[in-house]
């Protein structure tokens, strides 16, 4: 199997002090900003971006207790899908990988060709009823998804099930016990409650997420439920524009959904930031964890404040800048 980035990740701890001098501003995200502590209290916190100077594509982040857990993309490199842990969203430690090797095709062993740039992409990580779940779909034949589970990410993962391919998927456990996956350009499919496969006769539909602006690719699904509403985050490349982070919200999981651009800005002189998720800490503060393309370095990890304004999770400032 291929080696490289996985070895860089393995047992590596990144240390960037939380009190560094560079943070976000309304224009360039380079000045200190205030992060909301609650409706009555505001406290200034600064940090340096990128918080991880390494390739951390397609991040998904959850919080379980005092720890944040993040999973990223390694494509053809193995061991694959690093799972990282942090107490502050800045200092991350790799605690495991979802898998040591994939054997879907001889190409993973460089036989009958190669899978460079393909393999494992855009994993979704979730925690439900005392168990961690991770779902991803390799971007190559035979185009099927993997579901891995564990009771403790630091102790390794077990393959739970295989099912159809879901591009850039987001696994979602609803309050009523039903389980769904959002993927592609607004696709929504219901799964069996035990994640053994697609639920026969369950929800299987395409949400109305396209409009006059959104005629191109939409991907990078990340879903949360907040104050009774469903929030679907995706990225888009509008015609003639640059990548931006969108949010769709609805009162019902099947919609209808309304759209808001929650992040659209350059950062530190590099192309627009886009694709990631939002997460809260134990005190109720919210943050955006988003990657940014940095050429040969890869897709570095950035951290931004997330302010709930009129029911929308705005990243950076109130205008998504």
Q: What is the role of each PLM region?
A:
Residues 1-9:
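Single conserved hydrophobic/aromatic residue that forms the stacking wall/gate
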Residues 10, 29-321:
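Carbohydrate-active catalytic/glycan-binding domains of CAZyme proteins
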Residues 10-17:
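Bacterial N-terminal signal peptides that target proteins for export
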Residues 17-25:
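Bacterial N-terminal signal peptides
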């Amino acid at each position: 199997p291929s080696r490289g980035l996985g070895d860089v990740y393995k047992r590596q701890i990144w240390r960037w002090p939380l009190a560094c001098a560079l943070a976000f501003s309304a224009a360039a995200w380079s000045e200190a900003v205030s992060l909301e502590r609650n409706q009555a209290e505001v406290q200034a916190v600064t940090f340096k971006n990128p918080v991880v100077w390494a390739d951390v594509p397609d991040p998904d982040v959850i919080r379980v207790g005092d720890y944040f857990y993040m999973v990223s993309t390694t494509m053809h490199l193995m061991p694959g899908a690093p799972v990282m842990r942090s107490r502050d969203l800045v200092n991350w430690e790799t605690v495991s990988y979802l898998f040591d090797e994939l054997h879907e095709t001889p190409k993973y062993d460089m036989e009958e060709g190669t899978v460079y740039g393909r393999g494992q992409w855009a994993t979704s990580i979730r925690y439900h009823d005392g168990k961690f779940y991770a779902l991803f779909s390799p971007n190559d034949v035979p185009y099927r998804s993997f579901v891995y589970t564990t009771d403790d990410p630091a102790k390794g993962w077990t393959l739970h099930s295989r099912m159809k391919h879901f591009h850039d998927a987001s696994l979602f456990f609803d309050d009523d016990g039903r389980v769904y996956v959002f993927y592609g350009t607004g696709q929504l499919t219901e799964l069996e409650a035990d994640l053994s496969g697609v639920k026969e006769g369950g929800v299987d539909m395409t949400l109305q997420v396209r409009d006059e602006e959104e005629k191109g690719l939409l991907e990078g699904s990340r879903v949360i439920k907040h104050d009774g509403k469903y929030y679907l985050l995706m990225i888009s490349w509008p015609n003639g524009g640059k990548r931006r982070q969108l949010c769709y919200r609805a009162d019902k999981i099947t919609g209808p959904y309304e759209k808001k651009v929650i992040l659209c800005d350059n950062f530190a002189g590099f192309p627009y930031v886009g694709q990631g998720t939002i997460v809260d800490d134990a005190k109720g503060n919210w943050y955006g964890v988003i990657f940014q393309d940095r050429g040969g370095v890869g897709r570095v990890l950035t951290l931004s404040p997330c302010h709930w304004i009129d029911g929308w999770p705005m990243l950076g400032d109130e205008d998504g800048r």
